[in-house]
Amino acid sequence: DVTFSLLGANTKSYAAFITNFRKDVASEKK
Protein backbone atom coordinates (compact mmCIF):
# COMPACT_ATOMS: atom_id res chain seq x y z
CA ASP A 1 0.00 0.00 0.00
CA VAL A 2 1.34 3.41 -0.96
CA THR A 3 -0.08 5.03 2.17
CA PHE A 4 1.71 2.50 4.36
CA SER A 5 4.99 3.13 2.49
CA LEU A 6 4.66 6.87 2.99
CA LEU A 7 3.84 6.35 6.65
CA GLY A 8 6.96 4.21 7.06
CA ALA A 9 9.11 6.85 5.39
CA ASN A 10 7.60 9.56 7.59
CA THR A 11 8.25 7.46 10.69
CA LYS A 12 11.91 7.04 9.77
CA SER A 13 12.25 10.76 9.04
CA TYR A 14 10.55 11.59 12.34
CA ALA A 15 12.89 9.26 14.23
CA ALA A 16 15.90 10.87 12.56
CA PHE A 17 14.50 14.33 13.39
CA ILE A 18 14.10 13.40 17.07
CA THR A 19 17.63 11.96 17.17
CA ASN A 20 19.12 15.11 15.67
CA PHE A 21 17.00 17.30 17.96
CA ARG A 22 18.24 15.44 21.05
CA LYS A 23 21.83 15.80 19.83
CA ASP A 24 21.33 19.55 19.40
CA VAL A 25 19.82 19.86 22.88
CA ALA A 26 22.66 17.85 24.40
CA SER A 27 25.21 20.04 22.62
CA GLU A 28 23.61 23.23 23.93
CA LYS A 29 23.49 21.92 27.50
CA LYS A 30 27.26 21.37 27.52
Curated annotation (Swiss-Prot):
The keyword Hydrolase applies. Keywords: Glycoprotein, Hydrolase, Plant defense, Protein synthesis inhibitor, Toxin. It catalyses: Endohydrolysis of the N-glycosidic bond at one specific adenosine on the 28S rRNA. GO terms for molecular function: rRNA N-glycosylase activity; toxin activity. GO terms for biological process: defense response; negative regulation of translation. InterPro entries: Ribosome-inact_prot_sf. SUPFAM superfamilies: Ribosome inactivating proteins (RIP). Its EC number is 3.2.2.22. Glycosylated. It comes from the Eukaryota. The keyword Metal-binding does not apply. Belongs to the ribosome-inactivating protein family. Type 1 RIP subfamily. Inactivates eukaryotic 60S ribosomal subunits. This is Ribosome-inactivating protein momorcochin-S. It comes from Momordica cochinchinensis (Spiny bitter cucumber).
